[in-house]
Structures are given as C-alpha cells and as structure tokens.
C-alpha cells in the first residue's frame, strides 16, 4: 500500500492505482482508454466522498497526524507575504519546537507563532517532535508581548501532541511556563486568533490557544489528552485508544457544537495534505475575515469579549 494512504483509504488507493495502470497502457499505439479512465475517476470521486463523510474520531486523528500534513512552516510559506523569524526566550535557549516571528498577511503586519514538527528523523529530533519545553513557551510569550507593544495582532498555529514531559522540562518549570501563557494571553491587549492545524494536545496546545477566536481545520483534533494516554489511564490498555477517541469528542464538528471552536475550515478532499496550497488559501481567507472583525473592536471591548468567552467555558445548568 502506498505509504501516503491510511488503512481506511485502501479503496481510494486501489482505484488510483487502476487509473494509473490504464494511463500507462494508453501510452502504447492505437490504445484509447479515456472512457474507462473517466468512469474510474467518477467512481473515485464518489468513493472518496463516501469514505470521508463517515469518518470515525480515530480516523480523523490519523489524518491529523498524517506525516505529509502541512505544518506551521508550510503555511508560513504560502499564506504570508513576508516572514522574519525571531529566536530565543532571552532566559535559557531557543526551542525549535516553537517557531514564530513578524509577518505580513495581505500587507497587514502580524505576529505569527506556531508549533513545528519535523519531516525526517534529523528534523524531528531538532524540533523535538513538535513538543515544546518551557523555553519554547517563554519564547512564544516574549513574541506576544512584543506584538502587544507594537499593536500587532497575534496568530497562533497549534499542532502538538503535547508539551514535552521530560525531567529537563519539569526542572525548568514546564507547568509554570504554560500557566503563565494562559494568564498573559487572557489579558493581552491585541487581537489573538488561534488555529488548530493538526493535533491539539492538552496544555501543550492550550499554551498557544487562549484568544478571541478559535479556528480549527476540518480534520484537526483538540483534546485534553491523547486517546492512547486516556486508554492507558482509564482502562490500563492503550489498545483501547479507538474507544477513547470516540469518548474524548476531539473532532472539530463536535467541539464547535459545544461552543469551544468558533469556525471549522473545510479541508480539500482527502485532507489538507492532498492539496496544501489550497488549504493554506482557505485558511488565509478565514483569518483575514476574522482580523477585519476584531479590528472594529476597541481594546476594552476586545478584552471584555475575551473574558466573557473564557468564563463561558464549562458552564452548566443543574437539573
């Protein structure tokens, strides 16, 4: 099976292989298979739509983790006119799991900050698999405070399995760094738009996730823990991760129905990795619309609405 296809995409892979075989055959003399190719292409479109209409939470998670899914760096290349990366937390080190800096989107100056995973083994190690340490979150906060000083909106791109849980991170105050970001982002005097582009794992994601708007890509996920971790804790069996994924309610439509996500951005057929450029253009349009809406608010209105938004989470009515 083509490694770019997930298990549940096997019927799609088979049809695409047949189409390719026919195209190769048509290269010979006096062979015309266009009618058959068109018929298979129609069948492929219908089968793909059918599969992606009925995805389970576990299958959505596999798409969110797809090795070819666009990362922060990929969106930076397509969505922004300019990007100047800024490094370091000015206290300990530069954490490569977080990248951020000054950018322009349609000529508008913004501060962009996001998790960054790696493609190959070398880059994965360099980026620590997209799992930040305290210095990463402190770098992010430094850039947010800089944005506040210059009156720049903050755009965050969330894609992490979680904060790094190593002893080195704990000894440098991992929990404090995350908590500090939550406090400071709640009070930052500039617009903040948070977008979950892949995995949104626990506090490691939330440390870039407090803002005025939360946007989520169609096949991204957002939860307090990974399904594997949840299954290990609840049932002492990581093999029950599929069941945990359903119970966690980690998909974009589910979170939007709960009021935790403001907008879900539709992905290209087959997921963002099938057409990263189209995905980036769709997300760019959404972010520009949200920036325009937030620009109309005064600082006082912005903070009041953000406070009310945060206070609304977790409310319930007694029976």
UniProtKB/Swiss-Prot annotation:
NCBIfam families: accA, AccA_sub, PRK05724.1. Pathway: Lipid metabolism; malonyl-CoA biosynthesis; malonyl-CoA from acetyl-CoA: step 1/1. Residues 38-293 form the CoA carboxyltransferase C-terminal domain. This is Acetyl-coenzyme A carboxylase carboxyl transferase subunit alpha. It catalyses: N(6)-carboxybiotinyl-L-lysyl-[protein] + acetyl-CoA = N(6)-biotinyl-L-lysyl-[protein] + malonyl-CoA. One of its GO terms (cellular component) is acetyl-CoA carboxylase complex. Acetyl-CoA carboxylase is a heterohexamer composed of biotin carboxyl carrier protein (AccB), biotin carboxylase (AccC) and two subunits each of ACCase subunit alpha (AccA) and ACCase subunit beta (AccD). The gene is accA. Its EC number is 2.1.3.15.
